[in-house]
Amino acid sequence: MASRKAGTRGKVAATKQAQRGSSNVFSMFEQAQIQEFKEAFSCIDQNRDGIICKADLRETYSQLGKVSVPEEELDAMLQEGKGPINFTVFLTLFGEKLNGTDPEEAILSAFRMFDPSGKGVVNKDEFKQLLLTQADKFSPAEVEQMFALTPMDLAGNIDYKSLCYIITHGDEKEE
């Protein structure tokens, strides 16, 4: 009986520890941020099974225009989760990556996904289409308002490094 009780106590402690570990990740973010991560997770979880798998990642990259992603790269992403990547694991991975990360660097990193050539610009029309159709969809008026403040090159491409500065520091550069 005592050994049975000790076994039960161990399971309860392990369960509480797992709950504590998973609940901590939710305390790292505000509710609005968690909702945004949930929307991102839903966009990546193409087959809607609650787990991000290699096929989900491949399809997500394909939708972003990156068709030939090496298997090793996809495997490396999945291995970061050290098991199935459900929403809690997804949130934990982002929490670990963003904890101590400069918000400006996080924004630049997101823009770099749409800049495979590394030129520091993204195509205005493609970016507009993404804003109108993906995740937290912008209204056409919101897109036009954003583009009014967005630095562009002569070809009409968005200079995302300057835009990132405006987002993180405000409209005016310090002298």
Swiss-Prot record:
Coiled-coil spans in chain: none
Pfam families according to UniProt: EF-hand_5, EF-hand_8
Tissue distribution: Predominantly expressed in adult atrial muscle.
EF-hand domain mapped to chain residues: 32-67, 102-137, 138-173
Binding site for Ca(2+): D45, N47, D49, D56
A GO cellular component entry from the record: A band
Transmembrane segments: none
GO MF entries: calcium ion binding
N-acetylalanine: residues bearing it: A2
UniProt keyword annotation of Calcium present: yes
Keywords of this entry: Acetylation, Calcium, Metal-binding, Motor protein, Muscle protein, Myosin, Phosphoprotein, Repeat
Positions of modified residues (Phosphoserine): S22, S23
Single biological process term from Gene Ontology: cardiac muscle tissue development
Record carries keyword Coiled coil: no
Subunit composition and interactions: Myosin is a hexamer of 2 heavy chains and 4 light chains.
Misc note: This chain binds calcium.
Record-given protein name: Myosin regulatory light chain 2, atrial isoform
Organism: Homo sapiens
